[in-house]
Design a protein with these regions (language model features):
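A noncatalytic interaction/capping subdomain that flanks phosphate/NTP-handling catalytic cores
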Residues: 1-193, 197-198, 208-217, 225-262
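Hydrophobic positions on the alpha1 helix immediately C-terminal to the Walker A/P-loop
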Residues: 205
Length: 262
């Protein structure tokens, strides 16, 4: 019995190694194709998860990916996902199927499309039409975000940021990781998270800590990351901090969560 279990375990490890080898080869091929098509790959590490963003080389990466620079890292074959930015003449030409949902009470509005059992997504400033479309692979390991050509830079950053948050949330959850909507204060090497719906005063509560508690620092003001590592619950800064420019590549143990309501 033990010999049979050992053989099955060895076979499983071999299958996993073969799968990883195929995926590494696929990702290298994808990167080469993007490079040959005039795309530049950029790698970022958020809460220990590395992902790749491929954007046209003609774009100023320091501008489009400004908030990600503190999280920049070297190339990796062990990627959480890869996102590519593509420009199209007309978003209406991107085949995504019928609209199933348009969610959220305020921007960004979140669109869901369904076609032949496959889902794609979109984001927008208004409910009238999507401003970008995110076409994803079945396992969310690869995605392309489509933006109309000639759009102002803010539309490009809007599309990339929201697509990355979608991909990160979907892929990282399998690794004891949550991207949450909250404001986080760091104090005495510990993190305190303030949760609540938009408008309930998360940022205001953090500001009160900053103004009244010595040594308090803002870690992130909109979308921090919580992850369990070796049994310890940690809270990380992220490139996504809403209207507040607070993009800290830092981590502290999570000591408290407060849910605000009014």
């Amino acid at each position: 019995m033990e010999a049979l279990q050992a053989r099955k375990a060895a076979e499983q490890r071999a299958r996993q190694a073969a799968w990883k080898k195929r995926m590494d080869a696929y990702r290298r091929k994808l990167a080469e194709e993007k490079a040959s098509s005039g795309h530049a790959g950029h790698f970022f590490n958020v809460a220990g998860h590395v992902f790749q963003v491929c954007i046209p080389a003609s774009l100023d990466s320091q501008s489009v990916l400004k908030s990600y620079q503190p999280f920049a890292c070297g190339p990796s074959s062990d990627l959480l996902f890869t996102l590519s930015l593509e420009f199209v003449d007309d978003l209406a030409n991107v085949q995504v199927g019928e609209v199933k949902e348009c969610l959220n009470d305020e921007p960004p509005y979140f669109w869901m499309f369904s076609r032949d059992g496959k889902y794609d997504f979109g984001f927008s400033y208004t409910r009238s039409h999507p401003d970008c479309i995110v076409a994803v692979s079945d396992d969310f390991s690869n995605a392309v975000v489509h933006v109309s050509s000639g759009k102002p830079d803010r539309y490009i950053s809007f599309a990339v940021d929201n697509a990355l948050m979608l991909m990160y949330a979907a892929r990282s959850i399998a690794y004891d990781t949550l991207l949450i909507h909250a404001s986080v204060i760091r104090h005495s090497d510990a993190g305190y998270v303030f949760l609540g719906r938009s408008g309930t005063g998360k940022s205001t509560h953090s500001r009160l800590w900053l103004e009244n508690i010595e040594g308090a620092e803002l870690l992130n003001d909109d979308n921090p990351v919580i992850r369990i590592v070796d049994g310890e619950v940690l809270v990380f800064g992220s490139p996504w901090s809403g209207k507040t420019h607070c993009y800290k590549n830092e981590v502290v143990p999570l000591k408290g969560i407060v849910r605000l309501s009014q």
